[in-house]
A protein has these predicted regions:
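Conserved N-terminal catalytic/coupling substructures associated with nucleotide/phosphate chemistry
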Residues: 1-171
Length: 171
C-alpha cells in the first residue's frame, strides 16, 4: 500500500491518541491524513461499524480540541483491498496552536508532526504560534458610524442612568 510520513498516520483502531494526532496535523503547515483500521506497515485491517465510529470520531474532534475545528476535517470511508477503513482528512488550521482541551495550551496539549511521529511543542513554539494569531480587539474594529462623538456617548449613558466623568469613566 503506502507508508507513514509527516502527512500520513496509521492507527489499527480508534484509541485515546486520536486527539493528539489530529492536533499535530492541525498545527502542521500542510495538514495530514489519519487512517483508522490500517497497521503501521500500511496493511488494511478494517473497522467494524464504520458509521458509528465516524460519529464517535467527529464528536471527539469537535468536543476535545480547541480552537474550533469545524470545517477543518472530513471523515470518509475508504475501501483498501476490499476492506473498509476510515480516512480522516485534516487541514492545516488557521488559528494555531490547536490543543487538547483537557491539557490546555501546554506541551501536554499542543503537538506537531516531526517525521512520522507527533511530538509535544515546546513552550516557546506554543508562544510563537499564539502571538501570530490575529485577534479583533476593540482598537482594531472599525465602527460603521464614524460620526460619533464623546458628547453623544455621554448622552447615551445619561439616558441609561449612568454618568461619564471627565476621564470618560462610568460612575
Amino acid at each position: 500500500m503506502f507508508q507513514e510520513s509527516n502527512r500520513i498516520e496509521f492507527k489499527v483502531e480508534l484509541n485515546d491518541k486520536l486527539e493528539k494526532e489530529v492536533v499535530a496535523f492541525l498545527n502542521n503547515k500542510e495538514g495530514g491524513i489519519l487512517y483508522i483500521g490500517v497497521d503501521d506497515n500500511g496493511k488494511p485491517i478494517g473497522v467494524s461499524d464504520v458509521d458509528s465510529m465516524q460519529l464517535k470520531i467527529a464528536d471527539r474532534i469537535k468536543n476535545n480540541i480547541l480552537p474550533s475545528t469545524l470545517g477543518l476535517f472530513d471523515i470518509v470511508t475508504e475501501e483498501i483491498e476490499n476492506i473498509s477503513v476510515i480516512k480522516i482528512l485534516i487541514s492545516s488550521g488557521l488559528e494555531k496552536p490547536y490543543y487538547i482541551k483537557k491539557h490546555g495550551m501546554s506541551p501536554n496539549g499542543c503537538f506537531t508532526r516531526m517525521g512520522t511521529s507527533s511530538q509535544p511543542m515546546s513552550t516557546a513554539m506554543i508562544d510563537s504560534l499564539y502571538s501570530k494569531r490575529t485577534h479583533n480587539t476593540l482598537r482594531n474594529i472599525t465602527s460603521p458610524r464614524q460620526d460619533l462623538t464623546f458628547a453623544q456617548l455621554k448622552i447615551y449613558y445619561q439616558e441609561r442612568g449612568l454618568e461619564l466623568n471627565e476621564s470618560l469613566q462610568i460612575r
